[in-house]
Amino acid sequence: MKDLRDVIKRPVITEHSADLMAEKKYTFEVSPKANKTEIKDAVETIFGVKVEKVNTMNQKGKFKRMGRYGGYRPNRKKAVVQLTADSKELDFFEA
């Protein structure tokens, strides 16, 4: 990826991701072409924290129907980023 801001699309805020925040694990939706190294570099430079490890998962788009027409939602890639113990917490998840 050319620009690090193109790697991270948005944070994923769910019940499960809120529980993971207590362990300094944050969930992001990322570009499907991004790899773990690019995701780690993007989080470290944008938020100014140290990343311990990155776990990624690809989610296939679900089949959805609108009347008699069917189609698929887009595929997504999520990344769970674990910060080091001495790094600060990301506060943009707090509302």
From Swiss-Prot:
Keywords: Ribonucleoprotein, Ribosomal protein, RNA-binding, rRNA-binding. Coiled coil: none annotated. One of its GO terms (cellular component) is ribonucleoprotein complex. One of its GO terms (biological process) is translation. GO terms for molecular function: rRNA binding; structural constituent of ribosome. It comes from the Bacteria. SUPFAM superfamilies: Ribosomal proteins S24e, L23 and L15e. The keyword rRNA-binding applies. Belongs to the universal ribosomal protein uL23 family. Part of the 50S ribosomal subunit. Contacts protein L29, and trigger factor when it is bound to the ribosome. PANTHER family: 60S RIBOSOMAL PROTEIN L23A. One of the early assembly proteins it binds 23S rRNA. One of the proteins that surrounds the polypeptide exit tunnel on the outside of the ribosome. Forms the main docking site for trigger factor binding to the ribosome. This is Large ribosomal subunit protein uL23. It comes from Oceanobacillus iheyensis (strain DSM 14371 / CIP 107618 / JCM 11309 / KCTC 3954 / HTE831). The gene is rplW.
